[in-house]
């Protein structure tokens, strides 16, 4: 079967730690001081570069498996954050057949006064899965974790660990980026 694949990977320690340290999810914080040598603007550049480095590792891993791939870093084509971010999703639709398109959560430019923010891979996935034609599967692959929580930690005492997801399983929750 001829299947087109879009791979959306997370940031892990390449992006999350510095983004949290410099409060990048909040956007520009006037007059804020940080426990580190960088300004917020310098941290934006650093996190973008760190994400490009991680993305290069992903592309190299695919290449070693003889999988052709191309990268679309969100800071190069998307603006604003959340599920209503602005960006040309046709870049994914129009990618050459047989090429895996790789993207990731990223620090993107935002309207004033925020100036920048975190566009999460979760928001990218929602838009790609619902707006691109012919999408019939969304697969989450995770490593090094015990499973998926039914709700974010601390939101509800009724949250439970889902050790194995199946196609007949349904749960509902809300996710927010806390960086």
For each feature predicted by the language model, list its residue ranges.
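A glycine- and small-aliphatic-rich helix-loop capping segment at beta-alpha/alpha-beta transitions
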Residues: 14, 20-32, 117-123, 155-162
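Glycine-rich beta-strand-to-loop/alpha-helix junction loops that act as flexible
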Residues: 8-12
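Internal active-site segments that recognize and position negatively charged phosphoryl groups
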Residues: 56-58, 83-150
